C-alpha cells in the first residue's frame, strides 16, 4: 500500500515540477488524525497499527494528513453538497459500513477517534463473526462483503457455473444484476440487510437527533426500493418532526466519486480555518 502511494506521489511530482505537494489520505477504520496512525483497520489483512503519516513523511519529505474514509465523505458533503446544513450524517455502505457526523458545522470524532462505527453496532449477539472480533455486527448482515458471501453459498447450491465462482467471489455487478432481475433469494438477503441498516440508523437518530442523512457506497446501486426499506425501518421514530423542514430526510448522496475523494483534501482547509487569525 505504501509503495503504491509513493509511486502515485512521484508520478504527480514529475508532472507538476516545482509545485509543492501535500498528501491527504483516507482509510477505513479507526484513525488518529493528530498522529496520522491507522489504529484499527478491520478489513485489512494486518491487525497492528500503522503509522501512515510518519512513514510517508519520512519517505517522501512532504506533509501528510490521514483520516477516516467516512470523514472524507462528510467533508465532501459539507463543502460541495447543495444543501448548507450544520448537522448531518453520511453513511458509506460498501464492502464495510461506516458513518461520520457533522455537528454544528464541525466533524465529530470522539475522544478516541472511533465515532461513526455504525457497521460495528451489534444486531444479533449470536450472529456471524465480524472482522472486528465480535459477533453479529451490522457489517455481517448488511455489507456488500457479507451479502456476497451468502449469495455465493446460495448460487453454489443452485448449481451455478463453477467457472463463474472459481475465484471464490460473487462480483458486485453480478449481485446488483440478480437483485434488479428479481432473484427472490438475493432480494431477501439484500432486504434483510436494508432493514438492519434502518434499525441501526433508527437508534442513531434517537441518540443524536440528526435529520439529514446521505447514503454513499456501491450498495446504493440496489436503488430506490432498497432506500425505501431503510427509510421505512426508521419511520417509527416517535421523536421525529412532522413538518417538511425538520423531518428526517434519508437520501442517496449526489456527489460524484471524484468529488467524494476530493473531500479528504478539505482537511487542510478545515485546519487553516481553525487557526487563529
Predicted features and spans:
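ATP-binding/phosphotransfer module of carbohydrate and carboxylate kinases, centering on a glycine-rich
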Residues: 1-21, 134, 138-277
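A short, flexible beta-alpha/helix-coil linker loop
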Residues: 30-32, 128, 184
Amino acid at each position: 500500500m505504501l509503495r503504491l502511494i509513493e509511486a502515485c506521489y512521484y508520478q504527480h511530482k514529475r508532472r507538476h515540477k516545482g509545485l509543492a505537494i501535500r498528501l491527504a489520505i483516507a482509510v477505513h477504520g479507526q484513525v488518529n488524525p493528530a498522529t496520522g496512525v491507522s489504529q484499527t483497520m478491520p478489513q485489512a489483512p494486518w491487525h497492528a497499527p500503522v503509522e501512515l503519516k510518519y512513514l510517508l513523511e519520512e519517505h517522501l519529505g512532504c506533509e501528510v494528513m490521514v483520516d477516516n474514509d467516512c470523514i472524507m465523505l462528510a467533508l465532501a458533503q459539507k463543502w460541495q453538497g447543495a444543501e448548507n446544513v450544520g448537522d448531518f450524517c453520511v453513511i458509506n455502505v460498501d464492502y464495510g459500513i461506516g458513518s461520520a457526523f457533522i455537528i454544528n458545522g464541525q466533524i465529530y470524532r470522539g475522544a478516541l477517534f472511533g465515532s461513526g462505527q455504525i457497521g460495528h453496532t451489534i444486531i444479533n449477539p449470536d450472529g456471524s463473526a465480524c472482522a472486528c472480533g465480535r459477533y453479529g455486527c451490522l457489517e455481517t448482515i448488511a455489507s456488500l462483503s457479507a451479502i456476497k458471501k451468502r449469495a455465493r453459498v446460495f448460487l453454489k447450491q443452485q448449481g451455478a457455473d463453477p467457472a463463474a465462482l472459481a475465484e471464490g467471489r460473487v462480483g458486485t455487478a453480478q449481485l446488483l444484476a440478480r437483485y434488479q432481475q428479481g432473484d427472490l433469494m438475493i432480494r431477501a438477503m439484500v432486504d434483510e440487510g436494508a432493514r438492519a441498516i434502518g434499525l441501526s440508523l433508527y437508534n442513531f437518530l434517537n441518540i443524536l437527533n440528526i435529520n439529514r442523512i446521505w447514503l454513499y457506497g456501491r450498495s446504493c446501486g440496489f436503488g430506490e426500493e432498497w432506500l425505501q426499506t431503510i427509510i421505512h425501518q426508521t419511520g417509527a421514530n416517535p421523536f421525529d418532526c412532522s413538518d417538511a423542514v425538520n423531518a428526517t430526510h434519508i437520501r442517496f448522496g449526489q456527489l460524484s466519486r471524484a468529488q467524494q475523494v476530493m473531500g479528504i483534501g478539505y482537511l487542510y482547509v478545515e485546519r487553516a480555518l481553525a487557526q487563529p487569525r
